[in-house]
């Protein structure tokens, strides 16, 4: 199969969306498919492609107009390249203010598919008239797509509910994880690489891009409660983003002893990420952006990994948690929140028991096969979930083993690629038969 995979993404920066693009492209290429990834040209050069071709569309670095320019330019460039290479299908990342995927398909006669990592009407905070434009554009390009891939069943439900897209056209395919990159390593060796003491502390971590819906505030509030009982607990927050400065200020407002390795916003920084300073001098360490190769080292250094997703937007349409899959790949137990839109209950596994220190948290904290679930937006419950694992090293070890086994069985990018190809093969059967979704 020959595939064009078009996204508005800066491949020089590693975060959830770019990881998904690169890893899926690599997995499809490994399975013998001819993949061309098409993205805008940003200031920093993207990482060299691994097994797939990369084309970049000239970009205009004008604030508020970058995406609009890409939408306009991609209509020309993708059409031109598609007429030359004649891919079997055009696979577009979800867009907002455009119907470019539909137009290019009409101009070239090539079927197209859309991948939705979220549901824009649930996420955007814009005026009524702008939202009307978004919904009209999405109704056009979702409605005329041959298939719509969503990273969670909840997103598929929302697209069906709002736009009436037939359910047979909606194909939920969860994200994966690179099991070679995210694999267990010796915990003490990981700590030595980061400059951390091997013993004497309980390390609890989070990794990701700082969005308002990441829930790091809940973790920070829980940290204050944990430190009251376990003063040797240390919290390592790996990442950066638009919400970064707010989070460091919030941690300090809680009275936590904070260390910043580098700025937490999106500004480039040449400051080193490691070695980390002596944990005796901090309780919460914000690392800022770290090199890709260091992310698995950080995760492997932790006793417990966290994903404190809030409800609200996540509960409604959610997304597919990359970080939990990465934690699982490294064999680290997870404390997360029970959010249907992200499918955390499925990830953590069948609940075996419930435990709480008092009546208030009794029904809010549950133990699964690969971690602990708590209700969202509740720092007391999240702290209790952490305490369960802090107190029980053998439980942490068993959950970590279960997590890695689950990742190997359910979370590989090769499996995601196979499911994606299967969805596209259905498109080709429909095209050849002359049928159309109604």
Where are these regions (language model features)?
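Conserved donor-binding/catalytic core segment of Leloir-type glycosyltransferases
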Residues: 4, 197-223, 236
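Nucleotide-sugar donor phosphate/pyrophosphate-binding loop at the beta->alpha transition
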Residues: 69-73, 108-113, 121-141, 161
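Membrane-proximal helix-turn-helix segments that form the acceptor-binding/catalytic region
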Residues: 76-83, 99, 103-107, 130-150
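Short His-centered aromatic/hydrophobic patch
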Residues: 92-97, 116
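Carbohydrate-associated surface elements
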Residues: 154, 176
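Nucleotide-activated donor-binding/catalytic signature segment of Leloir-type glycosyltransferases, i.e.
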Residues: 247-296, 351
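Nucleotide-sugar-dependent
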Residues: 289-298, 305-328, 335-350, 362
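Conserved acidic donor-binding segment of nucleotide-sugar-dependent glycosyltransferases
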Residues: 324, 347-379, 388-393
């Amino acid at each position: 199969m020959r595939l064009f995979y078009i996204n508005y993404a800066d491949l020089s920066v590693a975060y959830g969306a770019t990881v998904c693009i690169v890893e899926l492209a690599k997995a499809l290429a490994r399975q013998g498919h001819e993949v061309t990834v098409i993205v805008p040209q940003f200031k920093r050069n993207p990482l060299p492609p691994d097994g797939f071709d990369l084309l970049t569309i000239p970009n205009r670095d004008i604030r508020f107009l970058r995406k609009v320019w890409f939408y306009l330019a991609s209509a020309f460039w993708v059409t031109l390249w598609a007429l030359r290479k004649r891919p079997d299908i055009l696979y577009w990342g979800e867009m907002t203010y455009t119907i470019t995927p539909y137009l290019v398909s009409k101009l070239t006669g090539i079927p197209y598919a859309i991948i939705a990592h979220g549901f824009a009407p649930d996420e955007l905070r814009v005026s009524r008239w702008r939202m009307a434009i978004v919904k009209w554009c999405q109704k056009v390009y979702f409605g005329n797509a041959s298939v719509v891939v969503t990273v969670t069943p909840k997103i598929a439900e929302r697209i069906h509910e709002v736009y009436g897209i037939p359910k047979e056209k909606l194909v939920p395919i969860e994200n994966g994880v690179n099991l070679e990159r995210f694999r267990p390593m010796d915990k003490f060796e990981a700590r030595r690489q980061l400059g951390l003491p091997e013993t004497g502390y309980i390390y609890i971590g989070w990794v990701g891009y700082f969005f308002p819906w990441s829930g790091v505030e809940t973790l920070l509030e829980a940290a204050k409660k944990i430190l009251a009982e376990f003063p040797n607990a240390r919290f390592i927050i790996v990442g950066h983003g638009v919400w970064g400065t707010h989070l460091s200020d919030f941690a300090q407002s809680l009275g936590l002893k904070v260390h910043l390795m580098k700025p937490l916003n999106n500004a480039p920084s040449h400051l080193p990420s490691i070695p980390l300073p002596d944990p005796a001098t901090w309780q919460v360490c914000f690392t800022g952006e770290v090199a890709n190769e260091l992310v698995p080292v950080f995760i492997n250094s932790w006793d417990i990994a966290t994903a404190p997703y809030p409800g609200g937007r996540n509960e409604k349409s959610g997304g597919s948690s990359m970080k939990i899959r990465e934690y699982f790949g490294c064999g680290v137990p997870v404390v997360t929140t029970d959010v249907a839109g992200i499918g955390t209950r499925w990830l953590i596994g069948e609940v075996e028991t419930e435990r709480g220190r008092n009546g208030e948290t009794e029904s809010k904290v549950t133990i699964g096969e690969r971690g602990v679930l708590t209700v969202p937006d509740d720092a007391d419950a999240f702290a209790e979930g952490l305490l369960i694992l802090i107190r029980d090293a053998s439980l942490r070890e068993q959950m970590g083993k279960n997590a890695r086994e689950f990742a190997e069985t359910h979370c590989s990018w090769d499996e995601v690629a196979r499911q994606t190809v299967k969805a596209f093969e259905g498109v080709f059967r429909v095209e050849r038969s002359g049928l159309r979704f109604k």
